[in-house]
């Protein structure tokens, strides 16, 4: 795996094998029995899946050394965001749906909404 030492690769592979065994130990329930019995089996299966998912997250985070909480993505303030069509302006409507051309009328509507 790119950028990793061989030793951590083997640790990661062991962790992935362990997680695979956890998931294989909880097969989907068989569709037999009364409706209520099937519903109860599925409910218990989903609860076990949630536990396995939590265990898998803990195993991977300890193996990879990453934090439990996701790192928040820093976004620029909305006032600084704008639509720039300087590259694509001048192309006709035959370019298709993906065209980023903005008409003067819609640009005025966008401008009036941001001045409030």
From Swiss-Prot:
<dbReference type="InterPro" id="IPR000625">
    <property type="entry name" value="REV_protein"/>
</dbReference>
<dbReference type="GO" id="GO:0030430">
    <property type="term" value="C:host cell cytoplasm"/>
</dbReference>
<keyword id="KW-1035">Host cytoplasm</keyword>
<dbReference type="GO" id="GO:0051028">
    <property type="term" value="P:mRNA transport"/>
</dbReference>
<feature type="compositionally biased region" description="Basic residues">
    <location>
        <begin position="36"/>
        <end position="47"/>
    </location>
</feature>
<comment type="similarity">
    <text>Belongs to the HIV-1 REV protein family.</text>
</comment>
<keyword id="KW-0945">Host-virus interaction</keyword>
<feature type="short sequence motif" description="Nuclear localization signal and RNA-binding (RRE)">
    <location>
        <begin position="34"/>
        <end position="50"/>
    </location>
</feature>
<dbReference type="GO" id="GO:0003700">
    <property type="term" value="F:DNA-binding transcription factor activity"/>
</dbReference>
<dbReference type="GO" id="GO:0016032">
    <property type="term" value="P:viral process"/>
</dbReference>
<keyword id="KW-0597">Phosphoprotein</keyword>
<protein>
    <recommendedName>
        <fullName>Protein Rev</fullName>
    </recommendedName>
</protein>
<feature type="short sequence motif" description="Nuclear export signal and binding to XPO1">
    <location>
        <begin position="73"/>
        <end position="84"/>
    </location>
</feature>
<feature type="modified residue" description="Phosphoserine; by host CK2">
    <location>
        <position position="8"/>
    </location>
</feature>
<keyword id="KW-0488">Methylation</keyword>
<feature type="modified residue" description="Phosphoserine; by host CK2">
    <location>
        <position position="5"/>
    </location>
</feature>
<keyword id="KW-0509">mRNA transport</keyword>
<keyword id="KW-0813">Transport</keyword>
<comment type="function">
    <text>Escorts unspliced or incompletely spliced viral pre-mRNAs (late transcripts) out of the nucleus of infected cells. These pre-mRNAs carry a recognition sequence called Rev responsive element (RRE) located in the env gene, that is not present in fully spliced viral mRNAs (early transcripts). This function is essential since most viral proteins are translated from unspliced or partially spliced pre-mRNAs which cannot exit the nucleus by the pathway used by fully processed cellular mRNAs. Rev itself is translated from a fully spliced mRNA that readily exits the nucleus.</text>
</comment>
<comment type="subunit">
    <text>Homomultimer; when bound to the RRE. Multimeric assembly is essential for activity and may involve XPO1. Binds to human KPNB1, XPO1, TNPO1, RANBP5 and IPO7. Interacts with the viral Integrase. Interacts with human KHDRBS1. Interacts with human NAP1; this interaction decreases Rev multimerization and stimulates its activity. Interacts with human DEAD-box helicases DDX3 and DDX24; these interactions may serve for viral RNA export to the cytoplasm and packaging, respectively.</text>
</comment>
<feature type="region of interest" description="Disordered">
    <location>
        <begin position="27"/>
        <end position="47"/>
    </location>
</feature>
<dbReference type="GO" id="GO:0003723">
    <property type="term" value="F:RNA binding"/>
</dbReference>
<keyword id="KW-0014">AIDS</keyword>
<keyword id="KW-0694">RNA-binding</keyword>
<dbReference type="GO" id="GO:0044196">
    <property type="term" value="C:host cell nucleolus"/>
</dbReference>
<feature type="modified residue" description="Phosphoserine; by host">
    <location>
        <position position="99"/>
    </location>
</feature>
<feature type="region of interest" description="Homomultimerization">
    <location>
        <begin position="18"/>
        <end position="26"/>
    </location>
</feature>
<keyword id="KW-1048">Host nucleus</keyword>
<dbReference type="Pfam" id="PF00424">
    <property type="entry name" value="REV"/>
</dbReference>
<feature type="region of interest" description="Disordered">
    <location>
        <begin position="87"/>
        <end position="116"/>
    </location>
</feature>
